Amino acid sequence: AASDVYKRQDYLHLTSNETINGVQLREFNKIEHDSLLIDMSSDIGSYSFEWDNLAYVYAGAQKNMGIPGVSICIGDEKYLNSEDNSRYLNLGQLVEKNSLLNTPPIFSIYVLKLVTDWMIAMGGINHFEEKSIRQSSRLYEQLESYGDFVIIPVSDYSKSRSNIIFKFKNEDLEKKFLIEATEKGILGLNGHRSQGGIRISLYNSITDEMVDYLSEYIDRFFTDNGK
């Protein structure tokens, strides 16, 4: 069985939120492996999780925690050093040098500090998890009510809260949806170039007011186009 194969490995690497297809994994403690490495670049800071079987978590800051140029690494000390890794890939060396193996991206680090201060002031992880659940649930329920027009190609148990993916059954209607959204100042709804469709990204900076505006547009569009 596949599970027996990965249990025998030294570690198991996962991406917690797959942004192209809108698939998310949050309950890491249900995976039967005691050394998980998780890339959380697109959903770090948006929900709480158990750390019992995690060896390392890392994330680029640019989606939820700041701007490009800096990554966040959180891990167990016993996984830091490896003789097989080049110096720039050896996290133990990075820790030993206080993240100063090279000239650090000062502004990116400063923005990360501002964002984390803001997150704490807003109520911390609990606030952003509640917001993520509220916003994503609202939009999924709304889109499911327009099942005559759109398809959500993700199983309920693996739907991403960060990236809502759906496709129109009518390609011309999809193009019209994107054009009119842009005219109303709603940008970045195009799906990944390899998949097409629509992608709604609900990162930590997205407010309820933004979701309200998008939701109103969705209702108005489908009312004007057949429902």
Cite the ranges covered by each PLM segment:
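Active-site C-terminal subdomain of aminotransferase-like
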Residues: 61-140
